[in-house]
Structures are given as structure tokens and as C-alpha cells.
Amino acid sequence: MSSNTASSSAGAAGSGDSSAARKNSKRPKYSKFTQQELPACKPILTPGWVISTFLIVSVIFIPLGVISLFASQDVVEIVDRYDTECIPAPARTNKVAYIQGDGDKVCNRDLKVTKRMKQPIYVYYQLENFYQNHRRYVKSRSDSQLRSTKYENQISACKPEDDVGGQPIVPCGLIAWSLFNDTYALSRNNVSLAVNKKGIAWKSDKEHKFGNKVFPKNFQKGNITGGATLDPRIPLSEQEDLIVWMRTAALPTFRKLYGKIESDLEMGDTIHVKLNNNYNTYSFNGKKKLVLSTTSWLGGKNDFLGIAYLTVGGICFILALAFTIMYLVKPRRLGDPSYLSWNRNPGGR
């Protein structure tokens, strides 16, 4: 009786130990995923597959490249660099002093239309060597202040353009302070060409990032004026030049939309531009350009996409041709294990 009791006690203890071991085990629950036993496909890259793949890529990419280049060639673009030409010859030895000085800085430029331009014609200003992506510059703004009057005093990130005499600047920060302030007045045959400045900003920016009850306050009233001024009677959501400028560029050369011409320009037309050369790009060796451009279904003029497609397609075609020649001239045995030396001659070394 006692032996039975002892054996049952030992059995109970053993089962308890095994269950405890199972409970304390760190072995993960078995699954094909954790044990890397999922079904997999390992294609054998035979010459036929490799050549066919390169040919398919080339057949797709080369036509896409040609289509993209044709679309880019349909875009008519006029680019005029004026930053140097709009400085009087005697003042070109010290351009910074000229642009910072008082006086009229009106400049007249004539642009020749070499090909018919259908409306809408987009007017851009292009800046070069201007690093809007600089960390300190990008962070110098207050998005909450731009959206609502409740956050008017949230200006800690905007230094040094945060306040004037203890009163907050709206909009604050270096981005708004450096707002582009060159202006363009276009005419053709002594008839003014209207440049529509409505609808140049993103709708999402106007509706969600700039409040319709937030008005400029103390803007450009510091010791140094950075760029354009803002009408204090117009809410920020309607100041589209500011909204366009506040969407910072990723690269040092960029274009920003100035307005739209909503009439066609014929080949041979001469566009007279009366511009105010106010913006100081001379202190950092920057460049300023005025751009008139049409668009295509692919966007503005940009040959890069077409060239990239053609380059990839051409490389794939050359590789397909090279592999075909190699396969026909000097074919290689299939990579089958049966061709391994120790399989073909098991007894050999």
C-alpha cells in the first residue's frame, strides 16, 4: 500500500515537473512562418529567362521614354535671367550696395515668343543657389500661429523674426520674412497682359494651413526688411504669394508660381516686361530668372524622365543582345547539380 502511494506520488511529481518545464520553455510555438518553412519559388535563371526579361523591360521603357520626350518637347518655355542685366553698368561692381540702396529699381525686358503658346501660360520666378532646405530656415515658422489667432503668441521657433517691441509678428519666422518681392508687369503691343494671381496656391494649404481669420500684424516692421510686405486687411488664407513661398523647396534651384496668363501668345510676339528688381540675391551669389511656360499632360518641360526611361531601356536591350550573342557563340552548361565534378565522377578527386 505504501509502495503504491510512493509510486503515485513520484508519478505526480514527475508529471508536475514536465508540465512546469513545458510552461517555462522558451521554445516558440511551431509555425511554418517562424520556422521559415513557407512555400517558396526559386526560379532558375536560364539564358532564355534572362534574355526575355531584359527584352521585355527594354520594349516597355524605350517607348515610354520616347513618349515622355515628345511630351516635354511640346512644352514651350521662355526663360530670361535678369539679375545682372537689371543692374546699371556703373553699379555692377557693388551689386549688394545697389540693391540695398534707395531709389527706383525698375527694369525693362523684352521676351520673344518663338512658338505659339496656348493658355494657360504659367509665370514663374526661378531662384538659384537659395537653400530653402537649410534646417534653421525651415524650422523658423509657427504653423499653429498661421492657422489660428489663439496661437498668435506661439513664436518660440521663429527667432530672430519673432516679435517687434514685445508684440508678436504675424506671420513670424525667417521664411515669411524673406518673401520674394520682385514684381512683373507684362504687355504685348502696348496692351497690358493680365496675370491672374488667384488659384496659384494649393487648395489644401489655403483651407488647412492658413487661417481665414488670421491677419498680418507687425510684419516687416523690424530693423531690417527681408522681402515683400503683406496687406494687413487680407487674411493669410488669401495671401497666395505668401502661401506659395511658405512651401519650401528641397533643392537650391527652384521655381515658384507667380501667376497665370489666360490668353494665347502667338509666334513672333514680343512680350514687354516691366519688373521691379527688389529681391536681394546678390549677397549669396544667387540668380533670378523669369519663366513663361505652357504645360503638357505630363507637366512642365522636363527631359529627365524621358532620358531616364531611354537609358534604362537601352541598357537592358544591350544586355539582352550581349547575352544572346554569348549564348549562341559560347553556350554555358546549365547549372544543374548533375554537372558537378563529384557527381559526374564519384570516385575521383
Curated annotation (Swiss-Prot):
It holds the Pfam family CDC50. It is found in: Golgi apparatus membrane; Prevacuolar compartment membrane; Endoplasmic reticulum membrane. The keyword Endoplasmic reticulum applies. Glycans are attached at residues 181, 190, 223. Keywords: Acetylation, Endoplasmic reticulum, Glycoprotein, Golgi apparatus, Membrane, Transmembrane, Transmembrane helix. Residues 1-30 are annotated as: Disordered. Expressed in roots, leaves, stems, flowers and siliques. The modification N-acetylserine is found at residue 2. It is a multi-pass membrane protein. The chain crosses the membrane at residues 50-70, 305-325. Its main location: Golgi. Coiled coil: none annotated. GO terms for cellular component: endoplasmic reticulum membrane; Golgi membrane; nucleus. Residues 1-21 have a biased composition (Low complexity). InterPro entries: CDC50/LEM3_fam. Interacts with ALA2 and ALA3 in a heterologous system. Belongs to the CDC50/LEM3 family. Required for the lipid transport activity of the ALA/ALIS P4-ATPase complex. This is ALA-interacting subunit 3. It comes from Arabidopsis thaliana. The gene is ALIS3.
